[in-house]
């Protein structure tokens, strides 16, 4: 990556301290946070709300149904128990939908290229990661946007590899420098795989591309059997075009992914007030109904094939019709969808942590933090779009990945919650300090015992005093993040082209 010149502030050890912290991380058994923290304490819907939404979902599937499935999908779902109405829309009786829910593989594992990065999607276990199809990269220094390229995807993957609180990497940008759709899909996938060993999410343009994709995956995994044993990518599949229509080409891609052993994210991305009802409750009902129809589709082909129920409804600013990914309503939508999917005991994914702000600034901070923590507290398994995304999904910032890693650490600490037991209630420590000690807990054995196991310390966020901040020439977080981006990429393996030349056989 070319270093972008930025206005520098004189620092006093901050960057060196961050390097030392990365070089000597805490052991996993001491870390206060990590992937798979258990959420579910935030419940925006009451039990009666859930029942009413559930009733509407089954009514929508049975009476309205979905249109435009490919012939192969229609045949498979009819055989599973769906039926075609007089209007030629595919309808789903409640018992058929519940059968699909029962057939769905629960507690799935999304594998990394190494076991360290495996994600176990048990009920309410929370993981944060990237996603998106931004066509621009944010130039934070010049306050400009430029078209995103394959190298940017690789750079983002390399950064994600080193961020403890970014647990998976779904392609966040489009390689606009690759015009041919097949070449773009293959180069995007390889840029991701080259940059990180964490689980990867990608999309594919056409069904016929899955064969060369599979050949690449088999080579990287060391054979088809090893790939199928530990599939380390998933297909983000927009199988539905809201409202209540199958996306024919995406469905054909999904069918091929199932045959190839690729886990599928069933993605319903309606926009409230445009392609979904303006009311939040109606949008939740429609999105969940669409995803449940997708579960019928998948299980009619291969019962138990690993898939994630991806309710991704977005919010519109109804004054303009533009998307508003950083709104409070977006946080509510994602959290409520998580609650509904938990009600059905399904592996869940939704989008949160986006912002409408164009740059990493105060607006982006409150937009990202408020929505990301709500999704985590609600127990969403996979929180997509939670790092780096700006401008309502139109721009992606590498510096924001660094800042958001700190933010997500605080979100995960909130998700973890408070342990209350005889040890944490600290009666003996209080008694000792008050009756025998100096009247404070600084340096107390109990304080030292929990300072690393209960508290999360950010990497680049500034917690210095105003005096120290002034003496350090008033550092700004965007400059610290930019330095961190350069550090991450300076000590990174070769570019995707170099890696491909060294790894891939000449016959590939």
Describe the residue ranges of each PLM region:
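Helix-rich catalytic cores of soluble enzyme domains
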Residues: 147-377, 381
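C-terminal catalytic subdomain
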Residues: 358-453
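Conserved small/polar residues in nucleotide/adenosyl-binding loops
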Residues: 491-498
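N-terminal basic/disordered segments at the start of proteins
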Residues: 2-41, 110-124
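A hydrophobic, small-residue-rich beta->alpha segment in the mid-to-C-terminal subdomain
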Residues: 452-489
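Glycine-rich, N-terminal phosphate-binding loop and its surrounding beta-alpha-beta segment
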Residues: 71-140
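Hydrophobic alpha-helical segments, chiefly the membrane-spanning helices
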Residues: 503-508
